[in-house]
Every structure is written in structure tokens, then in C-alpha cells.
């Protein structure tokens, strides 16, 4: 019997392949071939290294705003978790918060696993998906309607004690914003702007309404007649509401996946995780430290704070770090090899969502191309 991933890949092959390779040469042609093979409707890709000019390629459509360009903004989905972690670690480095303090010490509501009431939950656990929370139906039903998070949490506890097991949780990651707001008495949006985006000179926001440039839609390539899951034009028209007001009970739907930036911003953010500067060397090391394995989800992956830690020889001989994003049909990736000084970013409006061992096929192919190649991207 065919499994869902095999069926998906068969359906994908039935779609017409975009002609992105036409006019391309060298590695740019190989990148274009991967984007075509995975039916990317629109994409911006960058490969970079410490000792070479970056290789950048933009193809296809961003949806209602027209062709993808270097300046196109994308909702980067779960890469937001890595971006949020950068800011959290800088705040910890500056002594403004603690990674290992009980979050109940600052939150206006209690977060404690009922089966393990004596085990405190910390920011380190929230950043590493070891907090005991799971994305139960109550989370999916509540996050879109902004139900207070304290009303959702009781129905979202898993079976494992906090700090003992990995369970990918958007609710847990989203709670990071609530903790920061309660600790600093500022909105999450302003915390990220003041302590991360402005410091790095990055144009980014967690609210589409704050993006002045062209913002890509996001939609699924299968079925090909589907509507945009993320209609950028419609999202921009919504009122920003309490974006500048701390609301720990209601701002749990931001940090896990709502960050919006362009390729220039994404490269600056990835490089901030790749080398000391924004963070000092000890904090960089703490961010990359593997805290827990993905278990049955992937034999090659472990979790750091806001980072995947990937040891898969078929992709790269070195350990890779970064994060994947997948929402509304858009597939994104941001990964780096600190030993070789190389990195890659993928931003799309729509692409294949097929996955192997948690990583998407399109990210896997681009990572193999970027991190297994030697010398210049232009040879």
C-alpha cells in the first residue's frame, strides 16, 4: 500500500515543471533544476560562504504582487522560532531574562504539567520543544480566535515530563512571546524590533500590516486549484490591533511562525546565528548545543535552542544548523555549516511539501548541493 508521502510525490510529478533552467548556467542552473523538480511556484534562494560572492536566484511568482525579487517579503513560518531564539539569547546575554528560571515567576497565569507539578518549565525548554506541551485540538481551535492561552494550556499536555523528551510544539514556542512580554512589560513586536531587528538593520515584523514592501502569498501546489492559505493583501488590510501593547494571554500566536522578512533580512539573521557578533561565542555555543534528539521522527536530527542540529552524512560531512519553515503550502529553509563557513536560504510562495525524516525534499536537495560542493559557487 502506498503511503501518503509516495502518493504526494506521484501527484507532484503530474504537475507541469516550471522552465526555470532556461538561460541559467553552472550552479544557478542546478538550483533552478531543483526548484523546477519540486514545483516551486515562486522562490528566492541564496547560497553564501565566507570567501565567495553569494549566489542568488529569484524565480516564479509571489502571487498577487507579481514576480519574486530579492526585495520580496515572505512569511517565513517556523524559521520564526530560530529568529525568536536569537533575541531571547541576546536578552539572556544582557542579563534581562533567565533561560532557566521558572516561567511562572513572570507570567500572570500558571504553566505547570498536572502530572509533574513539581517540575518548573523554563525558556530553555520552550526553545527546545522539551516543555511537555503538544499542539492538541484546543490549540488549533483557539490560536486563530485569540482565545486566552491560559484557557488552552490545560488541554495541551503530553505524556512526558518537562525537560525529558522532544515534542515539536507551536504552542510551546508561541509561549516564548508571552514570557518575554510579561518579563519586560513590552509587546513582543517591540521587543524583537528593539533588541534584534534594529540592532542588525533588518526590515522585519511579526505583523503583515507593518510590511511596506511586496509581500508574497502562500498556497499549496497540490491541489493546483486551491486558494491562497496566506492571502498577503487581505492580511495587510487587517487592523494591527494591540501589536504595541503587551498581552501575554493573547500574543502566543506570533513567535512560532509569524515573522516576515526578505532575503536580505534572512541572510543577516542567519549569519547572526552562524558567527559571534550579535551573540558572543559562549551564547552561540549554547544555542547550538544538542539538548534532545528527534527520536523516531528523524535518526539524524537533534534540537538546540531554536535550531535543528543535523548530522546526516548524505547531506554534509559536517554538522549543520538551522531551521525549516512550512505553512500554507510555502516551504522555507535557513541552514549553515560553521566549519566550512557556508549557508543557504530558501524562501517560497509555494512548493512541494514532501518530506523525508522531517526535512522537506526541496530543502534536502538544496542543502546537498550547497554543502557538498567545493570551491566557488561560480566555478
Describe the role of every protein-language-model region.
Residues 36-46, 65-125, 160-171, 254, ...:
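Short active-site loop at a secondary-structure junction
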Residues 41-43, 54, 187, 330-333:
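Short loop/turn microsegments at loop-to-beta-strand junctions
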Residues 52, 114-321:
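Short, surface-exposed loop or secondary-structure junction motifs
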Residues 292, 314, 351-379:
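Short, gly/Ser/Thr-rich active-site loops of penicillin-recognizing serine hydrolases
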Residues 252-258, 321-336, 340-353:
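Glycine-rich phosphate/pyrophosphate-binding beta-alpha loops
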Residues 6-17:
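Short, contiguous pre-domain boundary segments
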Residues 19-76, 148-151, 155-156:
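Short, conserved catalytic-motif segment at the N-terminal edge
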Residues 69, 76-79, 87, 136, ...:
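A structural signal for the main folded, soluble domain(s) of proteins
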